Amino acid sequence: MVDFKMTKEGLVLLIRDYQNLEEVLNAISARITQMGGFFAKGDRISLMIENHNKHSQDIPKIVSHLRNLGLEVSQILVGSTVGGKENDLKVESRTTVESTGKVIKRNIRSGQTVVHSGDVIVFGNVNKGAEILAGGSVVVFGKAQGNIRAGLNEGEQAVVAALDLQTSLIQIAGFITHSKGEENVPSIAHVKGNRIVIEPFDKVSFERSE
């Protein structure tokens, strides 16, 4: 299910397609234990998951789990093994994982991915081609144009907010929309009536939780 491979990209944790995330996390822990003292705390690895898009919402939990085990994920690779040879990877794209706290005081550029298990606050812009994967809510004090996936741990109570919400994609828990907010109007995206709605700050009406 999981294994570490030495490749041209360096050391890669390869996770095959799976059905149960808890089984994957347990398998990662077991594999690292089997490897004894191979890793030092803070070692950086790459991560590749088969059927990346299917499992994208699990990435914050996987990255957080690896961090708790002392490993930092430097980049996420999208691709496949070549000719069944697991040590030869065909990489279609790669995104940099920002090892950061929940408060980011800069722009997030194209090709960068921010992964955090809780809320993420950005004092800057989220450019096209950038991505945020957050366990909680995401608030951008700037223009948001990239992909933002929120509520991956906390569920549909999470929100996505920005001073200018022009995202390519918003995901909150299991809900996805490609809609945008009104240009240059501070807006909040939240789940209401089993779908994501985007409303101006001054007109937002949240659905009451039971």
Curated annotation (Swiss-Prot):
HAMAP family: MinC (MF_00267). Cell division inhibitor that blocks the formation of polar Z ring septums. Rapidly oscillates between the poles of the cell to destabilize FtsZ filaments that have formed before they mature into polar Z rings. Prevents FtsZ polymerization. NCBIfam families: minC, PRK13992.1. Keywords: Cell cycle, Cell division, Septation. It comes from Thermotoga petrophila (strain ATCC BAA-488 / DSM 13995 / JCM 10881 / RKU-1). Coiled coil: none annotated. InterPro entries: CAP/MinC_C (IPR016098), MinC (IPR013033), MinC_C_sf (IPR036145), MinC_N (IPR007874), Septum_form_inhib_MinC_C (IPR005526). Belongs to the MinC family. It comes from the Bacteria. This is Probable septum site-determining protein MinC. Interacts with MinD and FtsZ.
